Amino acid sequence: MPNRHRGEIEAEIGGFRRTLVLTLGALAELEAAFGEGDLLALAERFAKGRMSARDLVHIIGAGLRGAGESVTDEEVARMASPDGAEGYVRIAAALIEATFGTADA
């Protein structure tokens, strides 16, 4: 069961229920992948609500690795979501919300 206080979520991807979390290391990985200089810039990028398929692969991959899975982005790109593209978007959105919260919070 995911620990929401630590920013963990659970999602079905690649045929298994998996835990994802954006640890400090995972966030640093995303800063580098997106060319953002700090966490505020990363949060602002996510707040825009526009994500490419490549963005989703980076976010989901970082979340899986943050939870301890040894997966590459190439492996993540081949993992199926039972809800297709919409499922990937929901997973990334839930992970970002668990990490950064919402504007209402």
What are the residue ranges of the model-derived segments?
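Charged interaction scaffolds used for protein-protein
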Residues: M1-E12, R17, E36-R54, R65-A105
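Short capping micro-motif at the N-terminus of alpha-helices
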Residues: L20-L22
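Short, surface-exposed, low-complexity cationic segments
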Residues: L24-A41
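A residue-level signal for conserved active-site and pocket-lining positions in enzyme catalytic cores
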Residues: I60
